[in-house]
């Protein structure tokens, strides 16, 4: 199965078979990600990181992934120091950076920016997050985490928090529909999952439940995927203040959880998971962040064609 020169824009572009292949590749590369083995798979390859929005885990895990495989990284640094501040449009930026690198990882605030960038690039584009639409590389690491810590087939999962603006849950919903998941959506009414995503799930015969209370579902699910309420996506700060503290995972809540429950979070968290949860067997979010390295290693290696 060849992924050479393949763009990674949306989970909708990948079949279940292809997703499993990428996860299998990540598993083979995990010892390299942990520093237990060395690899020069990306020797001679240059990976450009163009991040027009703040990022810690996505950007640094891509840097780690490239360097663990012997590749070199070009980093945009800050938008303020780039020609974007002079008025250069994204299409021209992509055309030029394509001449400097073998692959581009792009994060941009505009919905659909990654798909548009792929039209102008002469090298593969990996979407590191485009507006509130997609975050496929986060989804790959989420799937990898779930597979390692629980199971994918027929998973009972609750997604909670900002389901309206949260691009991580949008991508994850589609991917899990390929595995016959049972999905519970937990959010305030103001932050409900967009109807078009719910319709897509229903077309795939996925069982969906909606509620605004974690207490109602905590004993019924195998994975709880928490997300923060994204202040930067709210046009009205007052609306953010109304909903920011509506959902929180605490030790008291978890007294009613299944003992095998795993809690995931794409991070950063604000106050939606109490620090007391961090030391419990339920907490998987820090290991989840690490799994971003082997999964992104797999995507870099496959898209550049150094692994087939």
UniProtKB/Swiss-Prot annotation:
Alphabetized UniProt keyword annotations: Pyrimidine biosynthesis, Transferase
Domain of life assignment: Archaea
Any GO CC annotation of this UniProt entry: cytosol
Metabolic or biological pathway: Pyrimidine metabolism; UMP biosynthesis via de novo pathway; (S)-dihydroorotate from bicarbonate: step 2/3
EC class of the enzyme, as a word: transferase
One MF term in the entry's GO annotations: aspartate carbamoyltransferase activity
Subunit structure: Heterooligomer of catalytic and regulatory chains.
Record-stated family: Belongs to the aspartate/ornithine carbamoyltransferase superfamily. ATCase family.
Pfam families: OTCace (PF00185), OTCace_N (PF02729)
Binding site for L-aspartate: 86, 167, 228
Protein's job: Catalyzes the condensation of carbamoyl phosphate and aspartate to form carbamoyl aspartate and inorganic phosphate, the committed step in the de novo pyrimidine nucleotide biosynthesis pathway.
Protein name as it appears in the record: Aspartate carbamoyltransferase catalytic subunit
Any Gene Ontology biological process: 'de novo' UMP biosynthetic process
Entry binding sites for carbamoyl phosphate: 57-58, 107, 135, 138, 267-268
Gene3D superfamilies xref list: Aspartate/ornithine carbamoyltransferase (3.40.50.1370)
Gene this protein is translated from: pyrB
InterPro entries (UniProt xref): Asp/Orn_carbamoyltranf_P-bd, Asp/Orn_carbamoylTrfase, Asp/Orn_carbamoylTrfase_sf, Asp_carbamoyltransf, Asp_carbamoyltransf_Asp/Orn-bd
Record EC number: 2.1.3.2
Organism in which the protein naturally occurs: Methanosarcina barkeri (strain Fusaro / DSM 804)
S-S pairs: none
């Amino acid at each position: 199965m060849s992924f050479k020169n393949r763009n990674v824009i949306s989970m909708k572009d990948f079949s279940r078979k292809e997703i499993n292949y990428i996860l299998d590749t990540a598993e083979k590369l995990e010892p390299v990600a942990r520093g237990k083995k060395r690899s020069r798979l990306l020797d001679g390859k240059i990976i450009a990181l163009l991040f027009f929005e703040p990022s810690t885990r996505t950007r640094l895990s891509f840097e780690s992934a490239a360097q663990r495989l012997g590749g070199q990284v070009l980093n945009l640094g800050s938008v303020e120091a780039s020609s974007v501040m002079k008025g250069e449009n994204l299409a021209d930026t992509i055309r030029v950076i394509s001449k400097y690198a073998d692959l581009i990882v792009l994060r941009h605030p505009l919905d659909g920016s990654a798909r548009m960038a792929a039209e102008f690039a002469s090298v593969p584009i990996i979407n590191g997050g485009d507006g509130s639409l997609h975050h496929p590389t986060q989804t790959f690491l989420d799937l990898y985490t779930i597979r390692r810590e629980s199971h994918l087939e027929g998973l009972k999962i609750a997604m909670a928090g900002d389901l309206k603006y949260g691009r991580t849950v949008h991508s994850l919903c589609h991917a899990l529909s390929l595995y016959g998941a049972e999905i519970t959506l937990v959010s305030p009414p103001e932050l409900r999952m967009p109807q078009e995503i719910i319709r897509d799930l229903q077309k795939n015969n996925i069982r969906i439940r909606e509620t605004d209370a974690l207490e109602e579902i905590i004993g019924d699910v195998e994975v709880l995927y928490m997300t923060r309420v994204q202040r930067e996506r709210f046009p009205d700060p007052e609306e953010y203040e109304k909903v920011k503290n509506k959902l929180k995972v605490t030790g008291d809540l978890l007294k009613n959880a299944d003992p095998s429950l795993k809690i995931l979070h794409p991070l950063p968290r604000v106050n939606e998971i109490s620090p007391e949860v961090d030391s419990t067997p339920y907490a998987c979010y820090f290991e989840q962040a690490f799994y971003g390295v082997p999964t992104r290693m797999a995507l870099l290696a496959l898209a550049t064609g150094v692994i087939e």
